[in-house]
Regions:
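N-terminal secretory signal peptides
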Residues: 25-73, 83
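A cross-domain feature marking catalytic cores of carbohydrate-active enzymes
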Residues: 43, 76, 108
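Bacterial N-terminal signal peptides that target proteins for export
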Residues: 1-10
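Short, glycine/serine-rich, charged loops/turns that create anion-binding
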Residues: 45, 79-81, 111
Length: 148
């Protein structure tokens, strides 16, 4: 997990540095390219630190890259699905980030295994048939996967 945290921090650091350079260059194409960008963030652990990093990465992406050139989806499955519930400490973050077009997806297979109902999910969460199928689908569509 520490390795993933370091990678995520380095990526966000480069984005922040690139953003400053891009603004200084008076609206030239940013160093990461013109987009569009498609990012799938996969979370399958019931770990508050990982979810906090995921939320922070999404806010950074929205601020630095801009959601007009980026599409982001957070896919939660296994124990990680607990953070998509209404009573999650991140329910308000999910709702506010959804307003920027960020998609939050819950694995239906995990929901069945954990006896969860759609009504238990936070506002803004959609259900996908299965996490593995969603990962494969997004990969085939050219999305970049970041495993939090």
């Amino acid at each position: 997990m520490k390795h993933r945290l370091k990678i995520a921090s380095v990526i966000m650091g480069f984005c922040a540095i690139g953003s400053t350079a891009a603004m200084a260059a008076n609206h030239k194409t940013p160093p990461w390219g013109p987009g569009p960008f498609k990012v799938l963030l996969e979370v399958n652990q019931n770990n508050r630190a990982e979810w906090a990093i995921t939320i922070n990465n999404l806010r950074t992406m929205e601020r630095v890259v801009g959601m007009n050139t980026a599409h982001a989806e957070v896919l939660a499955w296994g124990p990680g699905i607990k953070f998509l519930l209404k009573n999650s400490p991140y329910a308000s973050d999910i709702q506010s980030l959804s307003m920027y077009g960020i998609k939050f997806s819950a694995c239906h297979q995990t929901m069945k295994a954990m006896h969860l109902k759609k009504a238990q999910l936070a506002s803004g969460v959609t259900i996908v048939p299965g996490a593995i199928a969603e990962i494969i689908k997004r990969h085939n569509e050219g999305w970049t996967e970041i495993k939090e």
